[in-house]
């Protein structure tokens, strides 16, 4: 155990020495720009003394290790036949010594394979592994643990290494970087190799120097890094030679075969589903040739189409595995206000009868009249299609009614053209004023609620101005009607005398 602890300490000191030398080089560069900075000079002196102490400690540890190995070799030479196990121990220690610090692949407790580095051994069958590409603080190896000075134990935020059986370790697969990989998303680390790895994008690659230019995605900074500081993924690359993968693939193939047989039996007995594509070798990426899947896409700006295309849907397909979903939006019938249901149903029937009578009309004429007839029919069909209110249109109409102003102006003009007003018209004005005040209150709340959303806020403000203008004109008409009624009643009183 003492030799293993010395090996761990030696590895840690090597890492610490590398980091201190890198820090010293950066301090030297800073001193070139500002040689009279007292803080930089003091840090430079402290780094030099720390590097000297670490080198002395490394020299002492290596000397002790070499003396121990020499004693083992001498003891093996002195004992010929009776001590075979002791003769084999140096071979095991040499093998472990060769493996110490080497890269490998190991399976984590989450079931994924990661790239790691052997930092020591726990007994004869277990190795202590650290993550080669740590992407979080919990994956980074604790420096104080390597120095046996960590006071937090199992509650430490950093990793104290993972105990993995030596038999389950796999050889490390080196990534072959090529020019074709430019533009791909990767993981990279800048500065020391023992920092946290970050997401980046490979911007360029030099095959001769084996150096790539990367752009980090978090802060948009760029750097030139070697292949040791780059990784295609935070997980380890798997090869076809892995026995466990072959077994998993066989199990998946057998499971997929059974699923195919079940699905074929299902297809024979039931209608074929159109929700998803059939199993094919064609790529199923984002469908760019289809902008709209259904009429309700007018309200989603094509975002839902892209999401559905990435899942394998095509235009005209119903939602669901067997295509049982609806294709058209839900129709909404807006009934006349302040009327009974009997009146509304009769009004709808009368409208349908009128449309049927219009369809039955025949006209005699030539090519010109037929063309005009077809154009009118197409225009009527388009208007009818647009006039069909769906759920989204109803919501938009309730929030931003576009025809409210026209209806209001027409109703005001009609009342003004009727001539003398009565109390019934005054009641209608009062109802309209109440509705406009309620709408104005809702719009004011909407403006206050959506101050951060510029588009909604501007639309609501514009509509609020229109409602205020309509309210002012309605109040003026109401006042005029009230004055007219009062003057008319006064005139009647005077006529009695």
UniProtKB/Swiss-Prot annotation:
Q: Which domain of life is it from?
A: Eukaryota
- Zinc fingers (C3H1-type) at which residues? 136-163
Q: Return the InterPro entries for the record.
A: G_patch_dom, Znf-CCCH_4, Znf_CCCH
* Ranges annotated as biased composition (Acidic residues): 239-268
Q: Which GO terms describe its molecular function?
A: DNA binding; zinc ion binding
Composition-biased stretches (Basic residues): 357-372
- Residue stretches making up the G-patch domain: 300-346
UniProt keyword Zinc, yes or no: yes
Keywords associated with the record = DNA-binding, Metal-binding, Zinc, Zinc-finger
Where are the residues of the annotated region Disordered?
Answer: 236-281, 352-387
Compositional bias of kind Basic and acidic residues: 373-387
PROSITE patterns xrefs = G_PATCH, ZF_C3H1
Lyase as a keyword?
no
This chain belongs to which protein, by name?
A: Zinc finger CCCH domain-containing protein 22
